[in-house]
């Protein structure tokens, strides 16, 4: 489902009166429904969710953690996924047929995932096969549609997360000489660089021009799809320069969805879980600037008052589509379950699911 499809989805919209309810009343109702359903209901929440939502999550995590939890949970009849569309798709594919996955707001998409559609990817693969022959293995960030995961699974590849990208890339290079990395060029570039692959052996594939942007294709080992995260691309070298001038003692940690320039100028980089763990283990009184989604940064600020924490970009805003999952939508979704009329059910077609699972399972077996 593209971001346009998500934003214009014909799925039933939440009645407007939910927006008029007090926070206290909504929280009381959500808590009551959770108690009534017990283990029949499971609510996973991504770290980028608002506090008003994450307080009701049965588990909070990054994309890898939530994928693993979804796969292991066999008790819940309903999984109300507080994340974005591709995450709910992944949960549906990893859970059993008797489990129903629900997204509280079907408009909660991901612009990065939509930067690689299946038609463009098929065309790119044909061109790359003509150029390189059978020397390429595709990998896709889990921030991708089920169809892209299925494409990767069909061609012997695997999914990756920011937590395990390094280990999966190592595995992939044992399979083939070259990698096609979808859809986030920055995570692909940063991970490959950390493995010792020079930038001169990487090139961007432009899906609009349908060509590889290099004058020396024979040197290329990593083909990077021209996609990015609209949140993490807003962190810049200028942000870092201004911060260093203001406070030379501050440490900067960023997510690898940031550009290569930003990552190279930072003190550290890693997955959402890595960032959280690093801050938790940091010395009291230490100073940190964090380059990732604002809801998580604010949560870290509030939960670690003994440390000085700020956003690397003071003008950063939260992820727009992730924030479509709010307390009113969560309550509406749960009340529909209570009525026996679930809305926002996510169901990946079986043919797509079978091939996408190959890619997901290859990842999970190397994690």
Swiss-Prot record:
Pathway: Cofactor biosynthesis; NAD(+) biosynthesis; quinolinate from iminoaspartate: step 1/1
Cellular location(s): Cytoplasm
Uppermost EC category: transferase
Membrane in keyword set: no
Pfam families named in the record: NadA
Gene Ontology cellular component terms for the protein in this record: cytosol
Reaction catalyzed: iminosuccinate + dihydroxyacetone phosphate = quinolinate + phosphate + 2 H2O + H(+)
Name listed for the protein in its UniProt record: Quinolinate synthase
Organism whose genome encodes this protein: Bacillus velezensis (strain DSM 23117 / BGSC 10A6 / LMG 26770 / FZB42)
Gene of this entry: nadA
